[in-house]
Amino acid sequence: MSGYYNRQYSHFHGNNDRYQTGRYAYQENGNRYKGFQRNGSGNRRYSREGFGSQLRNNENESRPIRSQSRGISEIPRNPFATRPVVSAKYDRDEFNTKYHYYDIVSKRLRNESSFKKWKSEKIPEHGYVTTTELIASDKQKPILMARQPEQTSVDPRIRPMNGDAVSGSISAKKRYRKLRSALVRNSRIPYDSFYIGPEPPKEIIVYPSASNQQPIAAALSEAIIKNYFKSFGEIAHFEQFMDPNSALPLYVYLIKFTGPVSQPDAPYKAAYKASEKFKDAPYTVSGIKFNVILNQNTVLNSIKDKLIKQNAARVTEVNKAKRAIAEKSSGQKPQVIRGVPYDLTQVVNNRPVLFVPAKITFYHRFNAADFRYQLRKYNWAKIIDHYTGVYIVFHDLENAKACLEYESGALVINSHRTHSPIQIEFTFIEPKRRLQSNITNQRDINKPRKIEYSSTEELLEASTKQILKDLHNIIKRDILRRLVGPIIFDTLNPANYPEVVERQKKLDDEKKKREESQKKTTIKAKPAEFDIFSLYGPASKTKKLKRDRKADLGKRHLYTEESPDHQRKKKPKVEHMSHLLNDEISTREDTVDSLNVGSNGENSPESSGYESEDIISDESKKQSSVITTPEEDLPESAASLPDERSKELLQYEGKYKPIASEFPTPVYPYDDFDLNKSKQLSLDKFQLALKDEEDFSILKGIVSEKSKDITTDYTPFLPYSMWKLYQQIEQNGIIRDNQIALNEKEFDSTLASTTGSFIADGFKKIPDKLKSSYLLHHRRLAQPLNTVHNHQEQNFMALNGTESTNQEADLEQDNHNASSRLNRVFQRRFQQDIEAQRAAIGFESDLLSLNQLTKRKKPVTFARSAIHNWGLYALEPIAAKEMIIEYVGESIRQPVAEMREKRYIKSGIGSSYLFRIDENTVIDATKRGGIARFINHCCEPSCTAKIIKVDGRKRIVIYALRDIGTNEELTYDYKFERETDEGERLPCLCGAPSCKGFLN
């Protein structure tokens, strides 16, 4: 090998010098190393052929040694025998012949001249790069392009500024790094016995968010918060904090979690989960938003202090506003407060009212709903939208004054006309200090007045005077009863005055004879006439039970003079109004029947509800005798009339004299005039109402009193005015007859135009009760309306009324009932076959599911209803207790139903199609349901709703309560709960005889 290297070294020497320094040299001259040698002086040295190295002590004694060729096989001497021969590992012939061998000495490739270049004409000189080319609207093709050496390289992952994709890039979109709002926290480390560091928090703080409306007026129960956070873990401690200044809740809650001993990480995990869940969105309950955080360090105290300071500042602002209002009101003149309109006095019932005038509500189109939402924090009773304005009625005076102080001038509502905020100012109408009723006043008057004494001596003196006064009254009464009374009675004894007694007896006998003779002559002249005290005939002879005699005493003396106190103490007969009306009708009918009973010998109905022992004997007497004055258990003074009264009765005409009948009858028959809404008689009916001179004289007196102040003389125009009125009455009668002939009913007078043009009147809402006068489907007739327009032969045949038609109809009804029963039998068999096939297949399938209710339903349809909007009608006769249709809809939970009901009310959907199955399930047919939802309410329904189970599921089914005819409307009772607020009640338009008037 060629080359050399020179290096000093040291080795151990035997003399005093421990180490001897030598020189190791190598030169690229082809000589080989011969090992360590000694010189002539005995010093050791290393040498090579052709180059010698001398030691320090004898450098001149070195002699050159020629190097031998590489091919000599002489093994070099190595005194240490540990250092290998220095040679190249790949310096061999088999490696030197290879092209890739690299000469480490010359630092070049061997045989470089025999190498070939790799460049070709197909490949660019400087290489190539890969890019893409657009071949379609959404497709790209990779291509090769020559690389330019002067072009700088670009990171293919970065999009350039011009927006074009770089060649070789992975994606054309620029990838942005996600923005961090905070440092990313490490994952939570579970807490156990090997946990290092402070204990993690296991308490959370629930406090109101700053976005809530202040102050928080909603009443929130602690149980709601506690029950909700119980879902995260077991709660060991729950605490609510109050404001120390006002003792009002701060709505700040401290919740501490716990867990079983086997799970030490459970409370910490529960607190962490609760805080993480509401980290971004607040916890909302009852309209109040709450933040949830972990209780760390002094967070709880800082939150409490902040809320207490806010409440104190709010109280300071309220007091300041109160003082400003007081100063303002003291400086202004007292405002004249108007009262409540007369038509609202009963509704308001002398309660405090806040009033907003109509000039504000009408112009900005405010209604009661706007104020109802804005004043929802206050305990108001009712909000009335009147034509004079809006009246807000409160239960008590405190809430009314609080609303006036805080909301008057501060309440802002957006105008529905200008869409700008309007400041509302209230006018306070204080309730009148009215006196109590007469009974209360009487009690207050009779109640002894409480007297206070300043000392004990005054009390003893007053007590002594009262005792002496009572003793004086007792002694006086005792003297009158024991001494004065017996002396007076003994003096006035009739035995002491026999002449006076005999004279009085004679006068009484003569008077009695005269009355009897007068009575007989009166009966012979007019056998059907007698005195006014005998109008009730033999019914008064009916004996009463002992318990009813006292109550009947007032009935016997019905026309006698009684004191007002006695009349006030008598209790009226308590009966339902419908029964009283029935009694009135029956009495009129029985009046005519009672006159025929005497001649025909039939039993007459008695006015009393009890039977007597001598009724049979009395009736036998009535059959054989002429009508006479019945005997009554009355004193003679009441049973007989004096001479003057008898002569006065004889002077009256026959029609004015009392008639012998069981019930009193009027002189003239009752004229039932058809009055309109104005309660005024027309001119012709008014003339018919004047029967005799007595009526005319009374009318003349009334008119003369009313016409005293009239100075104009209308006498010349009176004939023309009368003729014009008669012409108008006649024309109105012709119009009314034409309306009845065309529309089967007279138009309501309130529907007429007041200005002569309906366009000038503008739009107005017509009540459903008035629509029946001009809409056919709103008319309630005896027979069901054919609003479905089924052109069947049964309707035509039913109008003939022949016996054959009725028999055919009955036969058809029987056939229909039999066919419906057969249909149910076939459906049950079909259902059994399906169940058998399902069991044979071995799995459930919707193809084999059958709803039995759809097969059993009757043919019904919906059309315009006479009750309300749309109704459900039967297309064929339906027998009682038969299934009609299923109430189909969306099955939802109770909380969802409440939310939807509020949403429907806000959106303007007036009708409610929510039907409750049980406490947790409600059927909503508002947007997804069948035609069964069109069934209207009626107080006398023809159907009923039942909840049955079909294949294990609850269904709502409508059944018939009675036989239902063709084209008859189907109704059932909604059974709504009664509303306490009169303004929230819905009127019932069913038109049934027993209609309750309201749905709720």
UniProtKB/Swiss-Prot annotation:
EC code(s) of this entry: 2.1.1.354
PROSITE patterns, per the entry: POST_SET, SAM_MT43_1, SET
UniProt gene name: SET1
Highest taxon in the source lineage: Eukaryota
Span of domain SET: 858-975
Biased composition (Basic and acidic residues): 549-566, 574-591
One Pfam family this sequence matches: SET1_RBD
Sequence motif RxxxRR motif, residues: 824-829
Disordered, as annotated region: 29-78, 543-644
Residues noted as binding S-adenosyl-L-methionine in the record, renumbered to the chain: Y974
Catalytic function, reaction form: L-lysyl(4)-[histone H3] + 3 S-adenosyl-L-methionine = N(6),N(6),N(6)-trimethyl-L-lysyl(4)-[histone H3] + 3 S-adenosyl-L-homocysteine + 3 H(+); N(6)-methyl-L-lysyl(4)-[histone H3] + S-adenosyl-L-methionine = N(6),N(6)-dimethyl-L-lysyl(4)-[histone H3] + S-adenosyl-L-homocysteine + H(+); N(6),N(6)-dimethyl-L-lysyl(4)-[histone H3] + S-adenosyl-L-methionine = N(6),N(6),N(6)-trimethyl-L-lysyl(4)-[histone H3] + S-adenosyl-L-homocysteine + H(+)
Localization, UniProt: Nucleus; Chromosome
Single GO term (MF): histone H3K4 trimethyltransferase activity
Domain called Post-SET: residue spans: 984-1000
Function summary: Catalytic component of the COMPASS (Set1C) complex that specifically mono-, di- and trimethylates histone H3 to form H3K4me1/2/3. Binds RNAs which might negatively affect its histone methyltransferase activity. COMPASS recognizes ubiquitinated H2B on one face of the nucleosome which stimulates the methylation of H3 on the opposing face.
Entry's family note: Belongs to the class V-like SAM-binding methyltransferase superfamily.
Any Gene Ontology CC annotation: chromosome
Residue stretches of biased makeup (Low complexity): 596-610
UniProt note: domains: The RxxxRR motif forms an adapter helix that bridges the nucleosome and ubiquitin.
Listed name of the protein: Histone-lysine N-methyltransferase, H3 lysine-4 specific
InterPro entries: COMPASS_Set1_N-SET, Nucleotide-bd_a/b_plait_sf, Post-SET_dom, Set1-like, Set1_fungi, SET1_RBD, SET_assoc, SET_dom
Native species: Kluyveromyces lactis (strain ATCC 8585 / CBS 2359 / DSM 70799 / NBRC 1267 / NRRL Y-1140 / WM37) (Yeast)
